[in-house]
Amino acid sequence: MSRPQFDPAAYAAQLEDKKARLAGLLAPFAAPAPEVFESPREHYRLRAEFRLWRETGNENRHYAMFEQGDKHTPILIEDFPIASRRINELMPRLKDAWAEPALGFKLFQVEFLTTLAGDALITLCYHRPIDAAWQQAAEALAAELGVSLVGRSRGKRIVVGRDYVEEELLVAGRRFRYRQPEGAFTQPNGEVNQKMLGWAYEALGEREDDLLELYCGNGNFTLPLATRVRKVLATEISKSSVNAALANLADNAVDNVSLVRLSAEELTQALNEVRPFRRLADIDLKSYAFGSVFVDPPRAGMDPDTCELTRRFERILYISCNPETLAQNIAQLHDTHRISRCALFDQFPYTHHMESGVLLERR
């Protein structure tokens, strides 16, 4: 993780540049002007990861970050204004704690995971085996800080408390509860994520047919979108994300979602009846009347076959973390679908990265 150039005074201009960039990429497809959802200027990032750096000639260690491609010139961090207030409050207290050998010896990396709801988990990574002495010290520290702790060393993982944090997000007047596991992907900007969920909920609209969701992760979008349709079939390949999504569905009493651990390629084969899958043994695909598909793919976007799969739906709701691959995918779909809505979500202030969304509807 490299440190963004934090400059609140430049935020508005940087956001305008992103808006212009997205509009330019989507201009060939006659897209409407993007709806823009701003980020808080500071304390917006709910996750942070730091290496530890020892000063030459003494035992002092600091939180450190590095510019991309340079692992030898540390940027020493005393506070981190883009991170949540909870992370900033925990950083000096943890730094005091690692003076104890049981916690600090050969500690080389620290990862913070927090939520808008105030929960926190800290992962401590070591170049040595962790043992009962570590666990005893970690239990005392977790109680003192009011957090869960996870210790990691080669081949070993010890959890003190829980290995996930609990989040609450408000979408269309309803609070959804999420378990967000340590080590799994979660949206880093909680406030913007909440806005993104609200936009997707509104863009999909109230439907009497069914929704297919690809790349569902921990169910971030699944929970609110499930309230807009008759049934959802959601797919995900990460086992930890599938387990988190199942727990989140149960915690929120959402009972119209079937979740299967299949890749997009495998699902395409199943829908085309190329071959059967044991993981679909309890699911009758012919019972679904799919009208919409929701996709939130990785930075590489959808592969051509998955793009062709989405073409068969009346509505394609697409959230993207890479506007270039979004534009490439839209180019493949443009002959059958038009962009009726698009949005820019500023998940990553002070960087060139952006999250965007489009609703494509059949011509």
UniProtKB/Swiss-Prot annotation:
Key words, A-Z: Methyltransferase, S-adenosyl-L-methionine, Transferase, tRNA processing
Pfam families noted in UniProt: tRNA_U5-meth_tr
PROSITE patterns the UniProt entry points to: SAM_MT_RNA_M5U, TRMA_1, TRMA_2
Which EC number(s) are documented for this chain? 2.1.1.-, 2.1.1.35
Molecular-function annotations in GO: rRNA binding; tRNA (uracil(54)-C5)-methyltransferase activity, S-adenosyl methionine-dependent; tRNA binding
Q: Where is the active site?
A: C321, E355
List, alphabetically, the InterPro entries matched.
MeTrfase_TrmA_AS, MeTrfase_TrmA_CS, SAM-dependent_MTases_sf, TrmA_MeTrfase, U5_MeTrfase_fam
Catalysed reaction(s) here are: uridine(54) in tRNA + S-adenosyl-L-methionine = 5-methyluridine(54) in tRNA + S-adenosyl-L-homocysteine + H(+); uridine(341) in tmRNA + S-adenosyl-L-methionine = 5-methyluridine(341) in tmRNA + S-adenosyl-L-homocysteine + H(+)
Gene Ontology cellular component terms for the protein in this record:
cytosol
Top class in the EC scheme: transferase
Q: Where does S-adenosyl-L-methionine bind?
A: Q187, Y215, N220, E236, D296
Its BP terms in the Gene Ontology are: tRNA methylation
Q: Which SUPFAM superfamilies has this protein been placed in?
A: S-adenosyl-L-methionine-dependent methyltransferases
UniProt-listed PANTHER family: TRNA/TMRNA (URACIL-C(5))-METHYLTRANSFERASE, TRNA_TMRNA (URACIL-C(5))-METHYLTRANSFERASE
What is the protein's known function?
Answer: Dual-specificity methyltransferase that catalyzes the formation of 5-methyluridine at position 54 (m5U54) in all tRNAs, and that of position 341 (m5U341) in tmRNA (transfer-mRNA).
Family, per the entry?
Belongs to the class I-like SAM-binding methyltransferase superfamily. RNA M5U methyltransferase family. TrmA subfamily.
Q: What is this protein called?
A: tRNA/tmRNA (uracil-C(5))-methyltransferase
